[in-house]
């Protein structure tokens, strides 16, 4: 009887619609991660928390099962959901890498891969052949638009991070070509409710307005006392701008260093200004908790007007604005920025 029940259970599982099997695997994995997270939250000692942190469920076993479903159902429309999950949720496993290759071959012309294709913006240049294949072979608007966006985003990031002028300029031109085609032919396409052209517009703005030598876009708002002020109020001085938030653990360690820099440079024709991205009540708490000694614009969220204008992707982010209001250093280290200010002051003596 037991044997018959087991055979029946296996038969029922294999007979379940493919979409149900895929969703079931994803839910099983996500529920196991969620349950482990709840254990970490509920743990009363650091030792207990570390115990659960070291036992976070791996996506590996689920990736193996998911790839088996893919291989057995290559011609089924719903299988793209499995491929998409492998590419986005199991990218570091062999099955995820295999799915990425399949996305550029077997599934390059399929409908339903747009969300996974968009996520390839985070895979860097190794994803370029896949994205080019989708652009060439796929006739569906969402998929082609997602590939153009992701490829443009990869080239944009290479341009933004490159220290090689020739490589950087080539990357910029490739990004511009992708984004211009996206804006011309697919301006209305949305992925998960967001227009791809809007994301591209932010990167286009950054390429042309947020580079070293550009005039820094105006930063303006109210400080913790409700007093309005602007970046341009400090024209004639070196201005170190830090985008940060109390929610950002990586920001906590640099705040005392920013205070030190503000004190060190106060007689060096330089100031430190912050753009805080917490909601107003949390911002005031963060300013007090970390004893922030420099003036801040309260932007209220990570999508506040100043943070959005500067297209922030990482926190903290530092800029140095020179006395003429031009960007002198972008995404630089505090040490490099302070050294530049001191060197400029010494050169004037």
Regions found by a protein language model. Give the residues of each.
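Structural microenvironment flanking redox-active thiols in thiol-disulfide oxidoreductases
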Residues: 252-291, 301-308
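Conserved redox-active cysteine motifs that mediate thiol-disulfide chemistry
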Residues: 235, 243-260
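Short solvent-exposed coil/turn linkers within tandem alpha-helical repeat scaffolds
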Residues: 69-79, 89-125, 134-145, 161-173, ...
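Thiol/disulfide oxidoreductase modules built on the thioredoxin-like
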Residues: 288-293, 298-343
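Short pre-active-site segment immediately N-terminal to redox-active cysteine/selenocysteine motifs
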Residues: 237-239, 244-247, 279, 314
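N-proximal helix/coil linker or "cap" segments that precede and/or mark the start of modular domains
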Residues: 122, 167-224, 232-235, 285-288, ...
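Specific register positions within alpha-helical solenoid repeats of the TPR/Sel1-like families, i.e.
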Residues: 34, 84-91, 118-122, 151-163, ...
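N-terminal leader/linker segments that initiate helical-solenoid repeat arrays
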Residues: 12-60
């Amino acid at each position: 009887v037991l044997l018959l029940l087991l055979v029946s259970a296996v038969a029922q599982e294999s007979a379940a619609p493919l979409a149900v099997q895929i969703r079931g695997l994803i839910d099983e994995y996500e529920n196991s991660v969620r349950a482990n997270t709840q254990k970490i939250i509920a743990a009363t000692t650091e030792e207990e928390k570390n115990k659960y942190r070291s036992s976070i469920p791996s996506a590996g076993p689920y990736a193996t099962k998911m790839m088996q479903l893919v291989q057995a159902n290559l011609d089924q429309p719903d299988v793209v959901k499995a491929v998409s999950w492998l590419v986005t949720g199991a990218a570091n496993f062999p099955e995820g890498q295999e799915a990425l290759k399949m996305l550029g071959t077997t599934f390059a012309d399929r409908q339903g891969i747009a969300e996974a294709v968009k996520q390839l913006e985070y895979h860097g240049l190794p994803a370029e052949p896949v994205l080019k294949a989708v652009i060439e072979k796929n006739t569906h608007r969402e998929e082609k638009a997602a590939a153009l966006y992701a490829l443009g985003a990869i080239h944009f990031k290479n341009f933004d991070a490159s220290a090689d002028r020739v490589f950087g300029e080539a990357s910029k031109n490739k990004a511009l070509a992708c984004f211009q085609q996206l804006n011309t032919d697919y301006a209305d396409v949305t992925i998960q409710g967001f227009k791809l052209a809007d994301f591209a517009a932010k990167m286009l703005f950054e390429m042309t307005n947020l580079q070293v030598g550009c005039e820094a876009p105006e930063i303006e708002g109210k400080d913790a006392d409700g007093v309005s002020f602007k970046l341009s109020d400090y024209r004639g001085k070196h201005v170190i701008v830090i985008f940060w938030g109390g929610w950002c653990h990586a920001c906590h360690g640099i705040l005392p260093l920013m205070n030190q820099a503000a004190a060190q440079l106060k007689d060096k024709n330089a100031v430190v200004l912050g753009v805080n991205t917490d909601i107003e009540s949390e911002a005031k708490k963060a300013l007090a908790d970390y004893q922030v000694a420099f003036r801040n614009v309260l932007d209220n969220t990570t999508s506040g007007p100043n943070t959005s204008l500067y297209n922030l992707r990482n926190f903290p982010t530092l800029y140095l604005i020179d006395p003429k209001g031009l960007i002198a250093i972008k995404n630089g280290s505090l040490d490099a920025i302070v050294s530049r200010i001191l060197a400029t002051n010494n050169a004037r003596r």
